[in-house]
Amino acid sequence: MESLLDRVSALQARARDASNAARARFEKRGQLLPRDRLGLLLDRGAPFLELCSLAGYRLNNLDPEKSVPGGGLIAGIGEVSGVRCMILASDSGIAAGALQPMGLNKHLRIQEIALRCNLPYIQLVESAGANLMNYRVEEFVTGGQLFANLARMSARGIPIVTITHGSSTAGGAYQTGLSDFVIMVRGRTRAYLAGPPLLKAATGEVATDEELGGADMHTAISGLGDLLAKDDREAIGLARALMAHVGPAVALPSSVRKTPQPPHCDPEDMLGIMAIDGRTPTDMREVIARIVDGSDFLEIGDRYGAFTVCGYASIDGWPVGIITNNGPIDADGAAKATHFIQSCCQSGTPLVYLQNITGYMVGRLHEERGIIKHGAKMIQAVANASVPQITIQCGASFGAGNYGMCGRGFGPHFLFSWPSARTAVMGGQQAADTMVHVTEAAMVRKGNIDKQKLEEMHGAIIDMFDRQMDVFTTSAHVLDDGVIDPRQTRDVIALALDVCRVGKQRAMQPMQFGVARP
């Protein structure tokens, strides 16, 4: 028995040594080897159960003394930020991470275990894809199960976090595209359906790797990447931080709450952050920093749809997702917010909306980019969210932005206003300019332009809108649940979250009738 165990250990060591032989090449590129990445990802001292380590042995090379097992993958179960996860890493130290014989079978088995055991799924991707010299049509067809499984995991509520350390090409690009969260490494990520050689052969187009599928492009333009890292080490740190927010939903409920911490930034500053006149821009991250535990905010997709701010934090120790605005919502911002809302619903994370929104972007370019379609998707996500939603109207709440940011009509569990809140279908100046333009055009058609009447109309419309939009009018009409001191925002949200949480946990005994007086 011991001799057989020694043989198993020797084969496992052979795979490690084969990958380690590429160390100098990886270090020259500023990269970590796959097993070093795995070591940094896992909690220190926690157990790691490696799976299917002998996959492909004697199938990639009939000589048992030369065959390297593993199938081109490293896989196993371990803890990341206190959450037990399934981890799958491309062993890119061997044959550039190309799948080896039985690698597909190993991959499918790893996914099967994750699905059956509801394990959060982390992928460390850097693979040249399938080895075309060993192409088999049956493996191509069966390989579709990989992508179907990723879709089923996400639908089931299993979070999928992917780091693209290098290439993620052709069908393998859908490993990235079907992930819930994607972290990309600047200068190393390559995610595209066709690389430069195939692109030129197929269409004649000439493009670089970076133009086609680089991290900067995907995090700023396509939106495929959510977080941008400068190197492997930072990417792994981001994955750990992300798992701390999205992973506990599938762990034991007692592990969800963290130790509450006061914000590092002083909440007393809140009175001077939001301009009363509504004309001075406000960076809503400054508000977030004075609400959340430790002023710690993990922003998602900060380079894509940048006016819309989405990210994870904790309030009084409980995880929350926060959405706010640093400008109008454009198509990219709406798509990002939709993805974020759905991700929070998947992980059971309550949503907090900090409204400071002048509306959705308008104009020919934005119409061509599908602002109506993407805005509608955001509204769909808000209306059908399955988690508690709490809205704070901090500043402007204009037009469809009120709807997309979970205004009163969308039934948030609680909605509070700051004294600086302003609610209207549009700003008074905008409404006045619009109506004067329409009226003036009608006068031109009749050949009689009355400038004094237009000026009087302009002033009257501004006055009408201004009188209706302030917090004293809206709160008087019960369009919120109260006006709060901005400095108490954190405490108000914490209490509202607790009310929602306890209400959901409370066991009720419904009857067909109410209790009647004797």
Protein language model annotation of sequence segments:
Residues 1-518:
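Ligand-binding clefts of soluble mixed alpha/beta catalytic domains
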